[in-house]
Amino acid sequence: MATFTDAEIDDLFETSGTIIDSIITAQGKPVETVGRSAIPQGKTKALSAAWEKHESIQPPASQDTPDRQNRSDKQPSTPEQMTPQNSPPATSTDQPPTQAAGEAGDTQLKTGASNSLLSMLDKLSNKSSNAKKGPWSSLQEGHHQLPTQQQGSQPSRGNSQERPQNRANAAPGDRGTDANTAYHGQWEESQLSAGATPHALRSGQSQDNTPASVDHVQLPVDFVQAMMSMMEAISQRVSKVDYQLDLILKQTSSIPMMRSEIQQLKTSVAVMEANLGMMKILDPGCANVSSLSDLRAVARSHPVLVSGPGDPSPYVTQGGEMTLNKLSQPVQHPSELIKPATVGGPDIGVEKDTVRALITSRPMHPSSSAKLLSKLDAAGSIEEIRKIKRLAVNG
């Protein structure tokens, strides 16, 4: 985006102001035709004759001709720019006043059709030339014109003093003709040159500012401040969103680790369940417990003690004796306490009972569990029993 300094912005505002003023003060375009002359047909000879007559009665150049020449350098001269304002004092005294007034009236009627058109073309050409040169060049031309106007102010004052005397000697018809044929541009020029202090030209641009070329003028930048404030607000909001996104990413980065830890926990719990399934807590009186729910159900049954003397008759022998075991529990048959002497080593019966309980507790197919039980019954050594146990655990 292009940036401008304060001086350049001021120049742009001033040039736009001068252009707006020129557009507002511009006069309307005359009636235009396409491919045809603006002069009506049949009036060309009359206009040329009027121009020749005007040239024949034109007085010699006065002392204010340098000012006119300087003005004609800026604007292209047309037949109607040559004012007939000085013509009434310079008319010959040989002609009667009525004849001079009649000729001037005929000239005005003949040239009236093209006066407005030519004056409008002159104004448009002056404005187009000023627009091409730029306001700075018009100011320089105005400065060049000021000395010439100051030099021509003294002679013009002399002419202005002589004009009332000549007009006083002229006829009343000449006065009316003079008022009708006076040219506005020449009258404005005489007003500028009259007086001790010359009239200051209006400046379309401040002289202290740097001139700006019309060819390189860019668009005004009034909306830059609003755009900058909007961009700053948007950048702040974007930074806040970025910070929140960073926090969210930091929090979500731990999700894969949590998932992996949860998977590991599930795996470890499954392994522990398998180990608990293989490791059976066997109650001496309840060897058929095969699940944790059954074990809990057995644990809910509590022994009940009956206070007071019991009935010892079942445990008293005929001789009035009672046999107690190692736990001081009464035994009905004393032969139960007498165990035969066995060779030291593992008991095959206990091993068989343990493996049989393991086979029945495992969730296996009934045919495979029946085969293992048949092999267990036929086993006669500890090694065979252990092989059957491995098959039950693995299968």
From Swiss-Prot:
Residues 222-285 are annotated as: Multimerization. CDD domains: MEV_P-protein-C_like (cd21031). The gene is P/C. This is Phosphoprotein. Homotetramer. Interacts (via multimerization domain) with polymerase L; this interaction forms the polymerase L-P complex. Interacts (via N-terminus) with N0 (via Ncore); this interaction allows P to chaperon N0 to avoid N polymerization before encapsidation. Interacts (via C-terminus) with N-RNA template; this interaction positions the polymerase on the template for both transcription and replication. The N-terminus consists of a long intrinsically disordered tail. The central part contains the coiled-coil multimerization domain (PMD). Forms a four-stranded coiled coil structure. The C-terminus constitutes the alpha-helical domain that binds to the nucleocapsid (N-RNA complex). Essential cofactor of the RNA polymerase L that plays a central role in the transcription and replication by forming the polymerase complex with RNA polymerase L and recruiting L to the genomic N-RNA template for RNA synthesis. Also plays a central role in the encapsidation of nascent RNA chains by forming the encapsidation complex with the nucleocapsid protein N (N-P complex). Acts as a chaperone for newly synthesized free N protein, so-called N0, allowing encapsidation of nascent RNA chains during replication. Residues 65-74 have a biased composition (Basic and acidic residues). Belongs to the rubulavirus/avulavirus P protein family.
